[in-house]
Amino acid sequence: MFIPKKSKYKKVFKGRIKGNTKGGSTLSFGDYGLKAMEAGRIQSKHIETARRVISRTLKRSGKVWIRIFPDTPVSKKPADVRMGKGKGSVEFWVFKAKPGRMLFEISSDVPMHLARLALEKATAKLPMKCKFVSNHN
């Protein structure tokens, strides 16, 4: 699971995910990628599940880059606890993805049809709409 080693603040406000991504919207490492089409919170377990699906589909060939990291803690109070008495403890970590953000990349030594299949399978494991992008036209 992806968890930061150290964080400046233990807990953060919920906030809103507004606008499009400022950076990280183009392919930087590989020739094929998975781009977010809508805003959403991606948990560390979603990233790990998508990574496993991609590596199994590619049969360990090629290189996979994970372009995101969950750096925002989400707190939750236990069940059957009354309101008040402070904020709950940190339950999991998320990455707040904006539309246009590149999530995963795959190297060019993998055939395009296999890369597309792997990234479409990974899309099913993520809580948002995504699309396949490539450097090849």
UniProtKB/Swiss-Prot annotation:
Subunit structure and binding partners: Part of the 50S ribosomal subunit.
- Superkingdom of the source species: Bacteria
Q: Which family does it belong to?
A: Belongs to the universal ribosomal protein uL16 family.
Q: What is this protein called?
A: Large ribosomal subunit protein uL16
Q: Which UniProt key words apply to this protein?
A: Ribonucleoprotein, Ribosomal protein, RNA-binding, rRNA-binding, tRNA-binding
CDD domains for this protein: Ribosomal_L16_L10e
- Could you tell me one molecular function GO term of this UniProt entry? rRNA binding
Name of encoding gene: rplP
What role does this protein play? Binds 23S rRNA and is also seen to make contacts with the A and possibly P site tRNAs.
Mind telling me which InterPro entries this protein's record contains?
Ribosomal_uL16, Ribosomal_uL16_bact-type, Ribosomal_uL16_CS, Ribosomal_uL16_dom, Ribosomal_uL16_sf
Pfam families in alphabetical order: Ribosomal_L16 (PF00252)
Q: Which organism does this sequence originate in?
A: Wolbachia sp. subsp. Drosophila simulans (strain wRi)
- Tell me, which GO biological process terms does this entry list? translation
List, alphabetically, the GO terms of the cellular component aspect.
cytosolic large ribosomal subunit
